[in-house]
Design a protein with these regions (language model features):
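Extreme N-terminal segment that seeds HTH/winged-HTH DNA-binding domains in transcriptional regulators
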Residues: 1-29
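Phosphate-bearing ligand-interacting subdomains
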Residues: 21-24, 126-212
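Glycine-rich Rossmann-fold phosphate-binding loop(s) that bind the pyrophosphate
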Residues: 90
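NAD(P)-binding Rossmann-fold cofactor-contacting core
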Residues: 105-126
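Hydrophobic/small residue at the entry helix of a nucleotide-binding pocket
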Residues: 93
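HTH-adjacent hinge/linker in prokaryotic transcriptional regulators
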Residues: 30, 34, 39-82
Length: 212
């Protein structure tokens, strides 16, 4: 596998994996870079360049074996490993993440949720216990956790991230509407839901304009 891969390539990998999974489910066994590019609205050369970053998986005159390429990309994405997950915040976003079925199929197991609301603490969401926020440190001392999902208001997100850092958590999926300051050893992926909506709004406002 290549040592350095650009952020742009990394961001495209989940799309490849998703489309290949759909093709496999539809019974498609092989696909060319041109066909995959048309499906993903990318050029065939871009497809080949991205995939070649990790080795040659295609064959001249044949293209790609759909199942094999899906498995290779899944391995590159780390999807062969099991990851234990906690969700901080049992509101709308936290609950939606807990209920999303694909995560468990891809090896992401939510083992606990945390919240401050008395009416939520002590209940279960999708079979996952909701614990009080002040039990976070004790829980992390007793349970190995790979990923923490922050589904909290911006005003408490940084403080909570700092608590996670002190507990040894090094991977955070942040849905709080703010970018967080974090140490270099911690991987934080920010998901700003409004960004996608604003991009959609821009494209609607400029529909039909020719790019120069």
């Amino acid at each position: 596998m290549a040592g350095h891969v650009s952020e742009a390539v990394i961001r495209r990998l989940p799309g490849y994996y998703r489309h290949l999974r759909e093709l496999e489910a539809a019974g498609v066994t092989q696909i060319s870079s041109q066909e995959l590019g048309e499906r993903m609205h990318q050029t065939s050369s871009q497809i080949r360049q991205d995939i070649n970053c990790f080795g040659g998986f295609g064959r001249q005159g044949y293209g790609y074996n759909v199942s094999e390429l899906k498995e290779h990309i899944g391995e590159i994405l780390g999807l062969r490993q099991k990851h234990s997950v906690i969700i901080l915040g049992a509101g709308s976003i936290g609950t939606a993440v807990a209920r999303y079925p694909t995560f468990s199929r891809e090896g992401f197991e939510t083992i606990a949720m945390f919240d401050i609301a008395p009416e939520k603490v002590g209940t279960e969401l999708c079979g996952v216990p909701v614990l009080p926020m002040d039990a976070l440190e004790d829980f992390l001392r007793e349970h190995p956790v790979d990923i923490a999902v922050l589904a909290l208001p911006a005003r408490v997100a940084q403080e909570t991230l700092n608590r996670l850092d002190l507990c040894g958590i090094t991977a955070v999926w942040n849905f709080a509407p703010t970018d967080l300051t974090h140490p270099e050893h911690m991987i934080v992926v920010n998901v700003h839901l409004s960004d996608s909506l604003q991009i959609l709004s821009y494209r609607m406002a400029h529909r039909g304009e020719t790019e120069h």
